[in-house]
Amino acid sequence: MRFFALFIYRPVATILIAAAITLCGILGFRLLPVAPLPQVDFPVIMVSASLPGASPETMASSVATPLERSLGRIAGVNEMTSSSSLGSTRIILEFNFDRDINGAARDVQAAINAAQSLLPGGMPSRPTYRKANPSDAPIMILTLTSESWSQGKLYDFASTQLAQTIAQIDGVGDVDVGGSSLPAVRVGLNPQALFNQGVSLDEVREAIDSANVRRPQGAIEDSVHRWQIQTNDELKTAAEYQPLIIHYNNGAAVRLGDVASVTDSVQDVRNAGMTNAKPAILLMIRKLPEANIIQTVDGIRAKLPELRAMIPAAIDLQIAQDRSPTIRASLQEVEETLAISVALVILVVFLFLRSGRATLIPAVAVPVSLIGTFAAMYLCGFSLNNLSLMALTIATGFVVDDAIVVLENIARHLEAGMKPLQAALQGTREVGFTVISMSLSLVAVFLPLLLMGGLPGRLLREFAVTLSVAIGISLVVSLTLTPMMCGWMLKSSKPRTQPRKRGVGRLLVALQQGYGTSLKWVLNHTRLVGVVFLGTVALNIWLYIAIPKTFFPEQDTGVLMGGIQADQSISFQAMRGKLQDFMKIIRDDPAVNNVTGFTGGSRVNSGMMFITLKPRGERKETAQQIIDRLRVKLAKEPGARLFLMAVQDIRVGGRQANASYQYTLLSDSLPALREWEPKIRKALSALPQLADVNSDQQDNGAEMNLIYDRDTMSRLGIDVQAANSLLNNTFGQRQISTIYQPMNQYKVVMEVDPRYTQDISALEKMFVINRDGKAIPLSYFAQWRPANAPLSVNHQGLSAASTIAFNLPTGTSLSQATEAINRTMTQLGVPSTVRGSFSGTAQVFQQTMNSQLILIVAAIATVYIVLEILYESYVHPLTILSTLPSASVGALLALELFNAPFSLIALIGIMLLIGIVKKNAIMMVDFALEAQRSGGLTPEQAIFQACLLRFRPIMMTTLAALFGALPLVLSGGDGSELRQPLGITIVGGLVMSQLLTLYTTPVVYLFFDRLRLRFSRKNSKPVVEI
């Protein structure tokens, strides 16, 4: 009593406390960062190594394996995968959530250093690492185009100057430059001219390397001066290399230009990048795992004027893709939804109370509670994101509940003629325990979420804490500011036996009377209600098993990512044509705004595309509908496939796959894996629950297998090293020398001119100079035959791995897809030497599915314990929790009605319903117990009176929660995929629970009361003295 009186009779102090809470909240709101979702990125580090010309199998055994053995010893590694292709190896290390990315980077560097002695010689550089996930979609893509600059010069400028500057911006983890390669001097040899002059390829290589050196020459000094010695020991352009003497034939000088075409070109001519049908250099910017995407993008945009000032006038720098506009639009939609929810909730209160003054009280209490929450969010290091703002939207219905319960009870005393301050004190005292019980039991629902580990726990933590803080502040405001305002703003009225019957008041009285009549009938037919109650429990179980499930709602971020997979024997020239064809098909779609793409490098038969869609307001279709439409057109392109997927704000794992979900096959036997992977992929491709099934196992690339006759080689004076060097010099784009420039280092690349290597007959023109100086054709000591070879070799851990990626057809859930895959694997009878498991998002989904029921049970158990403590009873908490089955049935039925799968967002809705619907029972049970204790009523009379007296606040709180969630259901625009499942779950659960719990709760109350009395009689037998 004294506690409440302290705030009621000291209005100035109470107002100042509320003002302080509001001001702190406003300050916190201004300081909070903005993000699409809470920070849930796994720390990921990518290690890269190269050995030009080495086959995928050579890269896997000689480069990847030694690095994996060393990197695998690092503490906190959650998953290690690698992919080796022609001349390149990439190892992805995914660490646990609690691993600091900088500390992990130091361990990675130490592991690379430890493995250095085990790596092969000839590597142009040491392995390097980057603190970024290559499977993540870039947060921004910049393009460079020019009418006068070559692609090589553009690439050089982009990688040497622009990429370095962008990488220094806070939050940027990696700047990947694609579309070409660094400038180089390319030497294209004429094998016939070399043969005529008697010059070997190794002789050319050694001559070039010896002619281009950079060594210290020292200095000359006398007693007065000092002269630094400088020589023309470097050759920097093609024109300087052409006259280089490489051999003397009968006293005549043979110059490089006589036997080769020497041009200023690029290191790797098998690269191409495009933007909207124009050749372009792409700068693909990815953020650090712990960085905020909006802050990082803002930092890049702020740097753009400086970048544009750096570039020459002949270069055009454009933003081809930016992830931030849709994120900002989504957050703006949530903020508007929050404002609408607050307005609707206040409208509900006004319709019930029919008083401007009375409505003003919750109209003040709700904003104070919500705004004050921002201060706590800032102190906790949270952000303004879709989930935290949705928590505040839902909290609107919660925080007004506390104010409604207090206000309605005070208003009841005022209507009975009590003075305002006395009514405020008496009314608050009566419902103080009820409000505390409601709030604490609601917060208790989220305790299991706060203790939940893994990605789901990280994802939901901000939601749970934000909502709990809002409820806590609301509890304080409802017991301090609300009664104070009631006592000083509301006026007492003359006692009247019947309320005024106007408008909503008349409807409410009619509803209350009808409810009273129906409740009497129900209390006389309790067995029928019991059957209905048990039926809802059974229906819950059936619906939960039957409803389709997924991990997270499929988002429409306005960005698509596509992976091209062509025939494994395709040439680079043909692959570049496929890229252009696919880009034209996509660019012609009316919903597409921008298309960029690239191909080449170590994976000639693959490419990547990034598509920016028009804003949601300018297109009718969702991203998935656009993908379905494009899939039909793209399927007509022969010799290649383009797999499209919508970019999501959550992507798990470091695998770069051509679809959203992955199923990984592991084996310690590479032949077994290569035998079973095609069978499994074929079976999965036939499943209607899967779409775009593809695999990263590519072992059907064309290979020319050369077989040396070692006896003949020995007789001819040729060793294997000389023969291999011939092949590397001829076909390997061998980097034979380095050109040092002030801003960068460039290579001299030697190969046989591609004009002479158009087909297999080129091997017949190759020759080796033996120990006697004679030219021996390759065909004298080698035979060749075509064969198949892998284009890539993949590992997970130290096991051979192959990942089958897939998308979901429209109308199919992830649970249906995973069940179909597991069923197919069982039917195929895959041997134990080949193990299959889901990876990435599909793996997290399965882990979440296993913990969902445990989480719900834990939430119910926590609420039960809290209610036990508050009521000092084992029975009454069960009465209160009996409201839950009807709410969950309503939620699951609503999801089925709207064809929405049960996702992590729907799980949040179920958890919220556990907290919402029990409020009705708490209000009934509290008043019934008080009526039995103080009024001397029977249980039947007490619960009947409690139901009628609390009918108005129950209707008000339920409708407030319902209208608070309704804007989530009706919301459209960006981010609605996240909001709608939450709104559907809550609205469906509230409607069903309101229809049933008004009747089931009093029946359950009486059942447990009779049960309690029965046990009391059994335990009250007279004691017989012995």
Curated annotation (Swiss-Prot):
Regions crossing the membrane: 15-35, 333-353, 360-380, 387-407, 431-451, 463-483, 528-548, 853-873, 897-917, 953-973, 984-1004
Gene3D superfamilies the record matches: Multidrug efflux transporter AcrB pore domain, Multidrug efflux transporter AcrB pore domain like, Multidrug efflux transporter AcrB TolC docking domain, DN and DC subdomains, Multidrug efflux transporter AcrB transmembrane domain
Topological relation to the membrane, as annotated: Multi-pass membrane protein
GO CC entries: plasma membrane
GO MF terms held by the record: xenobiotic transmembrane transporter activity
Domain of life according to the entry: Bacteria
InterPro entries, A to Z: AcrB_DN_DC_subdom (IPR027463), Acrflvin-R (IPR001036), Multidrug-R_MdtC (IPR023931)
PANTHER family membership: MULTIDRUG RESISTANCE PROTEIN MDTC, PTHR32063
Protein name: Multidrug resistance protein MdtC
Species of origin: Salmonella paratyphi A (strain ATCC 9150 / SARB42)
Upper lineage: Bacteria, Pseudomonadati, Pseudomonadota, Gammaproteobacteria, Enterobacterales
Encoding gene per record: mdtC
